[in-house]
């Protein structure tokens, strides 16, 4: 498979997860999913950075992304495209990817709290990769992708995540650049 096509295929597949992971930075806030409670170790379970509103909007915009992908495929790539999962397929896939991404982000926050890292503190790779791993895990049983796409996503996602964080910081959407 041509490298450019491989890159496009990987990004097209995972796009709802990327959107779901980015949206809470913009539309999040409100009640934290851990209700402000502490774990057995005395630290917060997850922290203030993961909220119900951010989770809801992350999943919603992930699904909207999948719906838009469906219509782009139909309009510009044709019904015989390898990317044509059908509308229902895109809704299910994007829901699984978005939910998996946000679950992975929550798990990353949970792990960071266990290591006494506060919200906003950097945890290299944990911050950049858990959302991708869980997005892929949630979706894989219904929508498997080849190993080369998985490997590519695991390599490029930290780079994309780091770059998007710098942009979000410059736009004053994040307090820290990492």
Curated annotation (Swiss-Prot):
What membrane topology is given?
Answer: Multi-pass membrane protein
Primary localisation category: membrane
Its gene name is: carS
Q: Name one Pfam family in it.
A: CarS-like
Q: Which GO terms describe its molecular function?
A: CDP-2,3-bis-(O-geranylgeranyl)-sn-glycerol synthase activity
Q: Which residues form a coiled coil?
A: none
Q: Please give an example of a GO cellular component term from this record.
A: plasma membrane
Q: Which is a GO BP term held by this UniProt record? A: glycerophospholipid biosynthetic process
- Give the first-level EC class, as a single word: transferase
Pathway(s) it belongs to: Membrane lipid metabolism; glycerophospholipid metabolism
The subcellular localization recorded is: Cell membrane
In the record, the note on similarity to other proteins reads:
Belongs to the CDP-archaeol synthase family.
Q: For this protein, what reaction is catalysed?
A: 2,3-bis-O-(geranylgeranyl)-sn-glycerol 1-phosphate + CTP + H(+) = CDP-2,3-bis-O-(geranylgeranyl)-sn-glycerol + diphosphate
Q: Name the needed cofactors.
A: Mg(2+)
Outline what the protein does: Catalyzes the formation of CDP-2,3-bis-(O-geranylgeranyl)-sn-glycerol (CDP-archaeol) from 2,3-bis-(O-geranylgeranyl)-sn-glycerol 1-phosphate (DGGGP) and CTP. This reaction is the third ether-bond-formation step in the biosynthesis of archaeal membrane lipids.
Task: Tell me yes or no: is Lipid biosynthesis among this UniProt entry's keywords.
Answer: yes
By what name is this protein known?
A: CDP-archaeol synthase
- Indicate the transmembrane segments per the record: 3-23, 56-76, 91-111, 131-151, 152-172
Keyword list (alphabetical) reads:
Cell membrane, Lipid biosynthesis, Lipid metabolism, Magnesium, Membrane, Phospholipid biosynthesis, Phospholipid metabolism, Transferase, Transmembrane, Transmembrane helix
EC annotation from Swiss-Prot or TrEMBL: 2.7.7.67
């Amino acid at each position: 498979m041509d490298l450019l096509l491989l890159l496009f295929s990987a990004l097209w597949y995972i796009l709802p997860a990327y959107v779901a992971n980015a949206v809470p930075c913009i539309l999040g806030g409100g009640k934290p999913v851990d209700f402000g409670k502490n774990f057995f170790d005395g630290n917060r379970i997850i922290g203030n950075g993961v909220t119900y509103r951010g989770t809801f909007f992350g999943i919603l915009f992930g699904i909207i992304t999948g719906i838009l992908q469906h219509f782009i495929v139909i309009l510009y790539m044709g019904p015989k495209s390898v990317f044509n999962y059908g509308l229902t397929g895109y809704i299910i896939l994007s829901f699984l990817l978005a939910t998996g991404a946000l679950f992975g982000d929550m798990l990353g926050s949970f792990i960071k709290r266990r290591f006494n890292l506060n919200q906003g503190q950097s945890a290299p790779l944990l911050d950049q990769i858990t959302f991708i791993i869980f997005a892929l895990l949630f979706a894989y049983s219904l929508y498997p992708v080849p190993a080369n796409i998985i490997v590519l996503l695991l390599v490029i996602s930290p780079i994309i995540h780091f770059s998007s964080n710098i942009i979000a910081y410059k736009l004053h959407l994040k307090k820290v650049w990492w």
